[in-house]
Amino acid sequence: MCSTCANVLKYYNWDPHFKLVINPNKFLSIGFCDNPLMCCYPELLPEFGTVWDCDQSPLQIYLESILGDDEWSSTYEAIDPVVPPMHWNEAGKIFQPHPGVLMHHIIGEVAKAWDPNLPLFRLEADDGSITAPEQGTVVGGVIAEPSSQMSTAADMASGKSVDSEWEAFFSFHTSVNWSTSETQGKILFKQSLGPLLNPYLEHLSKLYVAWSGSVEVRFSISGSGVFGGKLAAIVVPPGVDPIQSTSMLQYPHVLFDARQVEPVIFTIPDLRSTLYHLMSDTDTTSLVIMVYNDLINPYANDSNSSGCIVTVETKPGSDFKFHLLKPPGSMLTHGSVPSDLIPKTSSLWIGNRFWSDITDFVIRPFVFQANRHFDFNQETAGWSTPRFRPITVTISEKNGAKLGVGVATDFIVPGIPDGWPDTTIGEKLVPAGDYAITNGSGNDITTANQYDAADIIRNNTNFKGMYICGSLQRAWGDKKISNTAFITTATVEGNDLIPSNVIDQTKIAIFQDNHVQDEVQTSDDTLALLGYTGIGEEAIGANRERVVRISTLPETGARGGNHPIFYKNSIKLGYVIRSIDVFNSQILHTSRQLSLNHYLLPPDSFAVYRIIDSNGSWFDVGIDFDGFSFVGVSDVGKLEFPLTASYMGIQLAKIRLASNIRSTMTKL
């Protein structure tokens, strides 16, 4: 007999040395019946395991167990049962429980018999699927404790939420950089009490109108070579705006050290005058983490800063409750969480100025854009919807003219075509002729090598700085094929184009051969934006004076040590087989979401997303109330695409955004 068959026989009492016995009725806590799985609830039996008859041979049971396994059906490889069949003496059967069911039962029996005077134990699986996190050191005393009376009153007034296992463990919320360059009084972390602090609370908050109770926050510090430094955890009451000053230490606070090995736990108490908060209530108790003593690392030097990573985890306090259930599809008037402004993968990122893929982030002192840029009020200072589709206009010309003014037929701002590009030409032009591209010596550029080797590119084209459009031009009686169109925002004076960075219905300039004769011909033009004639120019959107606006140009600068960014993509150039960079103020998906949805974001805060490249480098991008994006580093470096984005929560704008990218240091 083979060894496998011998081992199988041992499962079923053919080996006299041992016998495995089980009673699956104990899996059910039923008090009125002593045999529920065979009497009252036989339909539940398959949920707990498989029943075999005792008259079947051991080998037959073994083979049937293998043949019923999913692994056999897909690979035809025999996998021994994880849990052996056992004797169910009360039913005269052999029962093989599901592994998870048996494990749950065993853990429950261990827990019942555990002596509360013994130390706690930690349970883990090899693959990390089962964990019981270490709790850390609880810090209290000066911080208010949860009020059980208020919690009970809130339950009586509105109903109690369902208890679940997610209430028992800490979940990741965010991480914060603490570097040796941060001085005393610098705020590293500020978060108001509310469901947004915890991913499970945020998820469940969609089902309720109100909440109440405290949240526990756990901080873990990790750093290399750290010698000293302290942080202060400060509880700031509702109605007080934290400031970056040591005067904040006049509020209740506790200190913890950078060399702290164990995690530190704080409770953010719910200081309220009502039974509960509506989801729109952001004026709640805040927890602020401030630098108390500067971080010291003796291994750091002038060209190399050092720091720690402070990991922030949260879980609901014992008194946290949700109140006033609402249907899942109902929308609250105050707005929703801005958790879907950036798609999870960069393969879905295109610009809001041009429709090609985003390839980089460009940090600038100032970022500005009006067209297709939306804020958290669902408003834009531009004239286009957050989508790309062909521009539709009509144009009337006579006497063989090729330059004219288009009349919008599809628009959201009267007279300005939806999708019209938002930069003007750099100088006065008389559109005519062909491309004229030369190098610094005045020699014509006709090859890629000549273009790449040229130290200076001179663009003498008479329609430079205009956008190239594929055209469907139609007019009654005109049977000729359509010609390429060149468009821009400018004042048309005879055959001249005068630059204008303010757009209105008189500045829709189109240069195109529409086969016009002496009589007036009105053409219906459908224009698809394809390229640009600004060979040798700086990136599109980089020059404030050439960016078009109706009246106001939305603009932003640095905030709290965070730098504004453009999202960079490119557009193809005319004549030369090359491209030019385009600066976009938003990802188009962000523009679309802000235009369609009302999101909840305080004016002094960021909606934070973590961007991770394929090599594991990451940095946080914060989107402010005006719709502009920021990063906390001065240079994001070379990123390995594709990138992924994940929502991290709401952060105060005055706090530097986190990253694991080391900024370039310069020594004078």
Swiss-Prot record:
SUPFAM superfamilies found in the cross-reference section: Positive stranded ssRNA viruses (SSF88633)
Q: Where is this site: Cleavage?
A: E124, A125
Which UniProt keyword terms apply here? Capsid protein, Disulfide bond, Host cytoplasm, T=3 icosahedral capsid protein, Virion
Tell me a GO cellular component: host cell cytoplasm
Record annotation: effect of changing A125P:
Complete loss of precursor cleavage by viral calcivirin
Marked site positions, Interaction with host receptor F11R/JAM-1: N459, N462
State any further remark.
Answer: Mostly expressed from a sgRNA. Expression from the g-RNA is low and occurs at a downstream start codon generating a smaller, truncated LC-VP1 (tLC-VP1) protein.
Family per record: Belongs to the caliciviridae capsid protein family.
- Name of the protein described by the UniProt record: Capsid protein VP1
| Protein source organism | Feline calicivirus (strain Cat/United States/Urbana/1960)
